[in-house]
Curated annotation (Swiss-Prot):
Transmembrane segments: none annotated. It is an enzyme of class 4 (lyase). GO terms for molecular function: lyase activity; metal ion binding; phosphoric diester hydrolase activity; toxin activity. Disulfide bonds join C45-C51, C47-C190. Belongs to the arthropod phospholipase D family. Class II subfamily. This is Dermonecrotic toxin LspiSicTox-betaIE3ii. The active site is at H5, H41. Its EC number is 4.6.1.-. GO terms for cellular component: extracellular region. Binds 1 Mg(2+) ion per subunit. GO terms for biological process: killing of cells of another organism; lipid catabolic process. Keywords: Cytolysis, Dermonecrotic toxin, Disulfide bond, Hemolysis, Lipid degradation, Lipid metabolism, Lyase, Magnesium, Metal-binding, Secreted, Toxin. It comes from Loxosceles spinulosa.
């Protein structure tokens, strides 16, 4: 997966899809009461990026529905994944609970459109901290309560706090989430990867590859903009790279030394199937 980072309005979405990105990351902001309102990041953000792009969340979902529905004039065949980076900091537990329910409601109303149409997006619901787990609890409860359990086949889950994954696994177990987990590791592009290192990323990949282990389906790294970082991630065996330069990452994947081992994921690929790196 070549995941374009911080895609918060329609112009930048078109630009990244034109570059060939098969997935995007979009930042979702909430009211103090927990209502999902906008695609928006704000300052500070990654280096060399405009931080204030924005669009209403309802409009965003309707637009990506058009882009990901075969037969629609706007359909983009290669567009198959969206990471919803949920901006939950500062919300009370009550607001978090409301937010999870309302995110489910909005996906049903504006993306799945109160019906099981042929939309192709897998949503990765990305929560910043495990202490905000009630958001996922009410999200799951609401989808099941209104009879949309089957659409969970198009949903993955992630905590982005770069914490000890053994503790994260316990949180997933407590939520009754035993599959469809995308684990991630990363840091802003303003800080060189050299200073962060890849030890945690390597740990996640090793855990993913344990035979029979089900709590990590995919591992992605963020936000990688330098060739050395992208090549390192590919060599380690990541499933996705989040980047501010999607065409650059795709170009690296397509180089002869990498194209024999890697290709961009398509809709025919299972977003929850493990592809274990050969020894």
């Amino acid at each position: 997966f070549a995941l374009a980072h911080m895609v918060n309005d329609f112009d930048i979405l078109k630009s990244y899809l034109d570059e060939g990105a098969n997935g995007v990351e979009t930042d979702i902001t909430f009211s103090d009461e927990g209502e999902p309102e906008y695609a928006f990041h704000g300052v500070p953000c990654d280096c060399k990026r405009w931080c204030r792009r924005t669009v209403g969340f309802n409009e965003y979902l309707q637009h990506v529905r058009d882009l990901s529905t075969p037969g629609n004039p706007k359909f983009r065949e290669h567009f198959i994944a969206i990471v919803l980076d949920l901006k939950l900091n500062g919300l009370s537990q009550e607001a978090l609970a409301h937010g999870g329910m309302r995110l489910a409601d909005k996906l049903i109303a504006y993306y799945w459109a109160h019906g099981r149409n042929a939309t192709r997006i897998t949503f990765i619901v990305s929560v910043p901290k495990t202490s905000e787990k009630v958001f996922l609890k009410t999200f799951l409860e609401e989808i099941k309560a209104v009879g949309y359990d089957d659409m969970l086949s198009k949903v993955a889950f992630d905590f982005t706090d770069n914490g000890d994954f053994s503790e994260t696994q316990k949180v997933f177990e407590g939520l009754g989430i035993h599959e469809h987990i995308w684990a991630s590791d990363g840091i802003t592009n303003c800080i060189p990867l050299l200073f962060r290192g890849t030890s945690r990323l390597e740990d996640l990949i090793r855990q993913r590859d344990v035979p029979g282990y089900k709590y990590i389906s995919k591992v992605y790294a963020w936000t990688y903009d330098k060739e050395t970082s992208v090549v390192k991630a590919l060599e380690l065996g990541v499933d996705g790279v989040m980047t501010n330069y999607a065409d650059f990452v795709i170009g690296i994947i397509n180089k002869p030394e990498h194209s024999s081992k890697y290709r961009l994921a398509t809709y025919q690929d299972n977003p929850f199937e493990k592809f274990v790196k050969s020894a």
